[in-house]
Amino acid sequence: MSEIQKEEQETQMFRYKDAFLPIEERVNDLLSHMTLREKVGQLNQRLYGFRAYERKGDEITLTKETIEEAKYFGGLGVVYGLYRADPWSAKTTENGLSKEYAIKGYNLLQRCCLEHSRLGIPLLLSSECPHGHQALDGYLLPVNLAAGATFDPKLYKEAVSVCAHQLKQMGVNLSLVSALDVARDPRWGRTEECFGEDPYLCSCFAKAAVEGTQSEGVAMVAKHFCAQGETTGGVNASAARIGERELREIHLPAAKACCEAGVKGVMAAYNEIDGVYCHMNHHLLTEILRDEFGFDGIVMADGVALDRLQEAVGDEPHAAALALSAGVDVSLWDNVFPVSYTHLTLPTT
C-alpha cells in the first residue's frame, strides 16, 4: 500500500483529519477518539516553556520533565512562555531562544508533542505579551499606561499588529495581552498594565489590541477578567469589594468591547468579587461572558490560580470541578487537573 493510500484510509477512519469537513464535525469526531487522559492533557498547561528546554551553545535539548509530560498525556495541550526571557525565567542571550534559535526550539518541542500524540494533535504555544512580546529579540511597545496616554487607539492597533506578525512567524498561537484591567488604585503594583482609569478609553484600546493581534492570525487572550484593578489596599490578587453596578459600569465595558471585536480567549483574574473567586464564578464566566456578551472562545486560568482555589475549597478534584463548571477551559502552571485525573482513575478497594 502506497503512502497516499495509507493517508486516504486513515482519513476515512478518522474524520477529523478531513480538512474539507466542517470544523465542529471534525472536533466532535476527534473528541470521540480521545481517552480521558488525553482530554485532561489538552486542558493542562502545567509546563513552563522556558524550562522545557536547555540550550548550551548551539545545542538545544528538551528536559526529561517535558518528554515525560508529553508521553503521559499523549501530547501537550498548551505550552506557556517558550520564548520568555527575564530575571524570573533566568533566560538570557546565553541560554535562551533568541531569534537564531527560536524556530529550532519550537520545532523540537512540537515534534516531541506529535511523536507522543496517538491522534497527531499539535500543541498550542502561548506567549506573554503585556506590552509587546516578552522574549529575546521580541518587539516591544510602551506599557499600557503610556500607550493609553497617547489617546490614539488606531496607532496602537497598528503597533500591536507588527508585534503579532512576529509572533506568527515564531509559531505562537495565543498572545496573552493585558487589556481588561482598569486603574483604580495607584498603589497596585500592576497599574502599568492598565490603559487608564476611564472605562471608555480602556474599551477603545482593548478593542484595538484584539483587532491588531488577530489581524495577523494570532489568537488573543485578554486578561484579566474581571475587576483585578479594584484591589483592596492596592494588594495584588486581593478581594474586589464592589457590587454589580460598579462591576458593570467600570470593569465590564473593556471585556464587552473585546467580545464584540471577536477575541478568541479570556483569562480569569486572581481576585474574588463579592466573596466569589473569579475562577469559580459561573455568573461571571458563563452568564455574563458567554451568554450575555456572546463570547465563544477559551477561558484560561491565571498562573497557579487553580492550585490556590484548591487551597480554598479543600482538594484538587473539588477545585477542578468548580473551575470547569464555572467556565474555565485551560489551566496555567497548575497541578489541579493532573492530580484530579489521578484521583479519578485510582482503583477502588
Positions of the model-derived regions?
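A short, hydrophobic C-terminal helix/tail in secreted or cell-surface proteins
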Residues: T345-T349
